[in-house]
Amino acid sequence: MTHATPQELQAETREIIENLLNDGSDPNALYIIEHHIAHYDFDKLEKIAVDAFKAGYEVSDAEELEDDNGKPLYCFDIVAEVELKAEIIDAQQQQLVPLVAKHGGIYDGWGTYFEDPNADEDEYGEDGEFFDDEFADDDEKR
C-alpha cells in the first residue's frame, strides 16, 4: 500500500466501512482504528512512532517480522479511537501518510474490529483505554 494515491486510500476506507456496517457492526460505536506502519530500519520506525505520539496518537509496541524474502521488517500500529466515519479516517491518513513517508516508512492501510451492537459492555473497559497495563491488577494484589 506504500504507493496508494489519496483517492485509492479513500476508496478503500469507504469499502471497509461499508463492509463492516453491512455485516452488522454498530454504526454508533467508537472504533479502535489501527494504521499499520512498517520499516526496514528500526531507528527510523521509532522516529515515526515518536512523531505520531507527538501528534496525539497512541502507538503499539513494535514487532519484528520477515518480508517475503526473509528480510527483517519492523512493524507497529498508530492507534486512535474514533467514530467510524470516512472523513475522520481520511483526515488521519492525510496527516499520517506524509509523516510515514518523511522517514521512508511503509503505510500499509488501516484496520479495526467488528463492534457488536448487542454487546453488554465495552470490551476495553469502562474507561475505553485500549492500552491498559495488563499487569496493573497483579501489582496491586501484591
From Swiss-Prot:
Pfam families referenced in this protein's UniProt entry, alphabetically: RraB
Intrachain S-S bonds: none
Compartmental location: Cytoplasm
Alphabetical list of Gene3D superfamilies matching this protein: RraB-like
Q: The organism sits in which domain of life?
A: Bacteria
The record's GO molecular-function terms, alphabetically, read: endoribonuclease inhibitor activity; enzyme binding
- GO CC terms of this entry: cytoplasm
Keywords recorded for this protein, A-Z:
Cytoplasm
UniProt region (Disordered), positions on chain: 117-142
Tell me the function of this protein. Answer: Globally modulates RNA abundance by binding to RNase E (Rne) and regulating its endonucleolytic activity. Can modulate Rne action in a substrate-dependent manner by altering the composition of the degradosome.
Assembly, in brief, is: Interacts with the C-terminal region of Rne.
Q: Which HAMAP family match?
A: RraB (MF_01888)
Q: Which family does it belong to?
A: Belongs to the RraB family.
Please identify the protein, giving its name as recorded.
Answer: Regulator of ribonuclease activity B
Write the lineage as a comma-separated list.
Bacteria, Pseudomonadati, Pseudomonadota, Gammaproteobacteria, Pasteurellales
In the UniProt record, the gene name given for this protein reads rraB
